[in-house]
C-alpha cells in the first residue's frame, strides 16, 4: 500500500496480510529462532505478519510486498537523521574500500572519542564496544571493581540490555512478552541486582539503609524509554545523585536511547546532572552496531590495559561504525537541529491527545524531546506499575490500524515512537490523521 493512501479497514489484520513477508517469515522460522533475531520483531504482542523490510530511505520503510510506511521506530531510535542519509552512506562506502576491520587502533576511534568527550563533560574517557548490552554490562563490572562492592540498584521497567545483571523486572522486550525474569539466570547472581520503582526516591533510600556499604552503583535511564516513555519526576535524578554521593556509590546513566537524542550532551545536559559513568549507543554509530561507556578519568583508568578490570572485543571501535558516527555527530551540532525534531515531536503528541479526546478514549501521551508514547490507560504513567495498566489488546488493534494506513510504530505498548530529522511536517500530519481514523475505526468495531 502506498503511504499516501489512507484506508479504513473493517478488518485491519486482514488488510495487513502480506504474502511475500509471510513466506519469508515462515521460511526464516526454520533457521532463525522464532523467525527473528530480536523478539519484539515477531509481532507477538500485536499479532499479524511481521514486517520484512526490503529497503529504507529517509523516513520511509519499504517492505518486500512493495508497501511503503512512514517509520516512527527509526531502528529503535538509532537513526536520528533517518534511513540511508547520503553523507553516512558515502562515509561507510568509502571506509569499506579502505578496510572494514583492522583489529588494531585507527585514528577514527580517537576522533570519535574526542567528539564524545567534548560533547559530554562528565565523560572524560571512553571505551567503544559493539552493543548497548555490552556497554551496560561492562559499566557495571567497572563499578563493582572500582568500589569493591557487589550490589547494583536498578529500576523496574528500565532496560539495560540482556546481560544477567538486568533481566529481572526489565522493560523493552521482556515487558512486551510479559517475562518478569529470564530462566538461565542463577538466583545467586540475580540476587546481586536490587529492583525498586522508577521515580521513587524513598525506595532507593530504603535499599541503601538495608544494604549499607554494599551497593556499587545505581543504574538508571534518565528518561525511561523501555516501559514506554516515562520522564523523571521533579527532583528524582537530583536525589539519585545526592544519595550515591553520600553513600560513595557510583551513578550510572544509561543513555543508549537518550544520548545525543534529547540534546547533543544527552539527557544529563538537559537535567544538569553529572553521573559517574555513562552508557551510550544507537545514535553514536549512525545506524551501525556500536556502543560505548565512559566517565571520570579516575574510574575509567581501572579498565585494562591501564588497570585490572578486564574488557575486550574483536570488533570494538571498528572503522565502519566510527566513520558512520563521525558522519552523524557534526550534523547534530547544527543550530536548531534539536529544536526542529522536538517541535515535530510535540506536534505529534498534541495530535495524539486530540485524537484520543475526539474518540472519547482514555489515554496518556508522555513525551520527552523527540521520543514519545501513547498509553491506552486512564491513569498517569509515572513508573512501570502504571505502564502495565495499559490496555494491551487495544494497543494491538491500534497498531494494526495504523500499519494498514502506512504508519509504522513500535509493535509494543512498552516502546517509544521516535522522530527523526527526515520526518516532515506532512509526515506528522499524516500520522495524526491516521490516528484519528484508527481510533474511530476501533470505536466502530
Each language-model region and where it sits:
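Conserved N-terminal phosphate-binding loop of PLP-dependent enzymes in the Aspartate aminotransferase
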Residues: 4-445
Amino acid at each position: 500500500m502506498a503511504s499516501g493512501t489512507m484506508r479504513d479497514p473493517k478488518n485491519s489484520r486482514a488488510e495487513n496480510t502480506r504474502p511475500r513477508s509471510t513466506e519469508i517469515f515462515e521460511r526464516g522460522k526454520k533457521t532463525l529462532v522464532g523467525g527473528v533475531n530480536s523478539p519484539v520483531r515477531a509481532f507477538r504482542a500485536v499479532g499479524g505478519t511481521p514486517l520484512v523490510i526490503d529497503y529504507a530511505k529517509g523516513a520511509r520503510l519499504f517492505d518486500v510486498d512493495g508497501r511503503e510506511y512512514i517509520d516512527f521506530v527509526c531502528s529503535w531510535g538509532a537513526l536520528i537523521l533517518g534511513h540511508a542519509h547520503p553523507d553516512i552512506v558515502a562515509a561507510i562506502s568509502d571506509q569499506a574500500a579502505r578496510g572494514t576491520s583492522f583489529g588494531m587502533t585507527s585514528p577514527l576511534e580517537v576522533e570519535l572519542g574526542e567528539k564524545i568527550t567534548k560533547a559530554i563533560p562528565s565523560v572524560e574517557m571512553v571505551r567503544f564496544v559493539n552493543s548497548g548490552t555490552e556497554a551496560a554490562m561492562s559499566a557495571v563490572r567497572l563499578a563493582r571493581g572500582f568500589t569493591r562492592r557487589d550490589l547494583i540498584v536498578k529500576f523496574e521497567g528500565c532496560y539495560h540490555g540482556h546481560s544477567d545483571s538486568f533481566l529481572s523486572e526489565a522493560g523493552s522486550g521482556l515487558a512486551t512478552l510479559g517475562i518478569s525474569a529470564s530462566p538461565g539466570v542463577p538466583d545467586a547472581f540475580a540476587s546481586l541486582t536490587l529492583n525498586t520503582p522508577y521515580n521513587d526516591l524513598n525506595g532507593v533510600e530504603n535499599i541503601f539503609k538495608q544494604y549499607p556499604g554494599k551497593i556499587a552503583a545505581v543504574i538508571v535511564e534518565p528518561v525511561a524509554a523501555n516501559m514506554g516513555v516515562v520522564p523523571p519526576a521533579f527532583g528524582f535524578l537530583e536525589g539519585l545523585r545526592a544519595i550515591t554521593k553520600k553513600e560513595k556509590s557510583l551513578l550510572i546513566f544509561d543513555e543508549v536511547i537518550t544520548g545525543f537524542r534529547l540534546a547533543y550532551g544527552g539527557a544529563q545536559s538537559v537535567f544538569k546532572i553529572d553521573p559517574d559513568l555513562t552508557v551510550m549507543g544507537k545514535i553514536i554509530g549512525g545506524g551501525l552496531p556500536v556502543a560505548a561507556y565512559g566517565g571520570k578519568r579516575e574510574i575509567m583508568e581501572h579498565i585494562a590495559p591501564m588497570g585490572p578490570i578486564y574488557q575486550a572485543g574483536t570488533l570494538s571501535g571498528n572503522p565502519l561504525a566510527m566513520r558512520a558516527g563521525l558522519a552523524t555527530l557534526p550534523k547534530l551540532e547544527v543550530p536548531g537541529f534539536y529544536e526542529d525534531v522536538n517541535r515535530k515531536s510535540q506536534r505529534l503528541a498534541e495530535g495524539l491527545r486530540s485524537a484520543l479526546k475526539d474518540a472519547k478514549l482514555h489515554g496518556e501521551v508522555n513525551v520527552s524531546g523527540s521520543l514519545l508514547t501513547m498509553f491506552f490507560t486512564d491513569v498517569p504513567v509515572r513508573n512501570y506499575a502504571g505502564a502495565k495498566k495499559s490496555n494491551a489488546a487495544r494497543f494491538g488493534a491500534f497498531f494494526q490500524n495504523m500499519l494498514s494506513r502506512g504508519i509504522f510504530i513500535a509493535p509494543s505498548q512498552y516502546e517509544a515512537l521516535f522522530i527523526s530529522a527526515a520526518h516532515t511536517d506532512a509526515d506528522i500530519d499524516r500520522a495524526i490523521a491516521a490516528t484519528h481514523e484508527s481510533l474511530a475505526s476501533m470505536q466502530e468495531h
